[in-house]
């Protein structure tokens, strides 16, 4: 890709207590034509000389106290959205400790221009990686797949690409620590924003001793964010079953049982999950595919309820079966990737 094109791409580097190699990383990125935004996340004063080496080559953001990677990323997105709209069309976030190869950063920059969605650089986690990194990665990958129905081999990677038009959306996503990056993926999944993966090198220098990731504290924070999403899902499912049971208990005609219960299920899943759990932002326009898949799930589940009704079978059991089918369909739609199409 030519330098002129990369000049329209910003590399956002959140930095806390940088390594002496940091200026070399900045120089290499600059030589490739990137716009560089550095956010000093409250580093200790003794690291100021390292920042002094790069200040004339970058847009530099700083504040007094360490507030976390998520906060630093959002400050960077805010700065780009407010000041660089004419200069930047796309943004690549990368770690400042050398974990991301410069060539991989450039490859993400190329791909995000083709997809115009989110690009996630994914490491090969089957390789030998430090234990404290594997703990968070494996747990996050498993829980994310169970809850969203989408398998991402590496959802903890900090190497990502975004269209600059998403800066306001990115600033509104909750989280100031490491959980922020996972919240971005969960919210993108719920709102139908496509996520494309690209293989990148797995680099852990000095057994990842320079990382500021705290295995227990940060893993709990990250998984808590995921589980909150799962709890909301469970609430909607429980509400659906309770609605069916109450209607059946009061002997309301079965026509109302399956129509009302299906309304609760599908509308709840497509409205409550998205508005209640993520209703903190100026929302993006949701894909038409999102509504089409909702209608398909509604029709299939309603047919199941009709079958149980006409056969005289226990209607609450039919509700469980319909719920199971809806969950499976949601999983299949998520794995197919069609939810991200506009």
Model-derived regions, located:
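Hydrophobic helical membrane-anchoring modules
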Residues: 2-9, 13, 20, 28, ...
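Short loop->beta transition adjacent to catalytic acidic/histidine clusters or analogous donor-positioning motifs
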Residues: 8-10, 28-38, 58-59
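Short, well-formed alpha-helical segments that are part of the catalytic scaffolds
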Residues: 16-31, 46
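Conserved short acidic donor-positioning loop in nucleotide-sugar-dependent glycosyltransferases
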Residues: 17, 41-45, 67, 76
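A conserved acidic beta->alpha catalytic loop
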Residues: 40-49, 98-99
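Conserved donor nucleotide-binding strand/loop of the catalytic core
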Residues: 52-86
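Acceptor/aglycone-binding surface of glycosyltransferases and processive sugar-polymer synthases
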Residues: 65, 71-79, 102-178, 205-213, ...
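Short beta-strand-to-loop acidic/aromatic patch adjacent to the donor-nucleotide binding site
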Residues: 85-99
């Amino acid at each position: 890709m030519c330098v002129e094109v990369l000049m329209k791409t910003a590399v956002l580097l959140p930095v806390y207590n940088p390594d002496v190699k940091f200026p070399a990383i900045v120089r290499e990125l600059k030589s490739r034509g990137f716009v560089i935004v550095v956010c000093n996340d409250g580093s200790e004063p003794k690291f100021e000389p390292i920042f002094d080496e790069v200040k004339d080559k970058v847009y530099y953001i700083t504040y007094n106290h360490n507030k976390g990677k998520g906060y630093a990323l959002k400050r960077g997105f805010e700065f780009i959205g407010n000041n660089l709209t004419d200069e930047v069309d796309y943004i690549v976030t990368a770690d400042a400790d050398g974990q991301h190869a410069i060539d991989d950063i450039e490859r993400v920059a190329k791909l995000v221009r083709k997809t115009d969605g989110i690009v996630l650089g994914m490491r090969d986690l089957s390789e030998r990686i430090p234990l404290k990194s594997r703990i968070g990665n494996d747990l996050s990958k498993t829980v994310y797949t169970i809850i969203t129905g989408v398998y991402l081999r590496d959802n903890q990677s900090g190497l990502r690409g975004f269209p600059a038009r998403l800066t306001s959306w990115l600033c509104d996503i909750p989280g100031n620590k490491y959980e922020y990056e996972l919240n971005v993926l969960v919210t993108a999944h719920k709102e139908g924003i496509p996520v494309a993966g690209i293989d990148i090198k797995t680099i852990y220098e000095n057994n990842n001793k320079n990382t500021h990731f705290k295995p227990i504290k940060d893993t709990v924070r990250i998984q808590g964010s995921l589980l909150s999403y799962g709890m909301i899902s469970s609430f909607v499912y429980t509400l659906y079953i309770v609605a069916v049971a109450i209607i059946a208990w009061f002997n309301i005609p079965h026509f109302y049982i399956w129509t009302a219960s299906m309304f609760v299920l599908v509308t709840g899943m497509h409205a409550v999950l998205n508005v209640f759990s993520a209703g903190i932002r100026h929302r993006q326009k949701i894909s038409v595919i999102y509504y089409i898949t909702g209608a398909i799930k509604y029709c299939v589940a309603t047919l199941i309820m009709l079958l149980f009704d006409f056969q005289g079978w226990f209607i609450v059991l039919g509700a469980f079966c319909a719920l199971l089918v809806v969950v499976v369909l949601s999983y299949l739609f998520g794995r197919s990737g069609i939810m991200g199409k506009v």
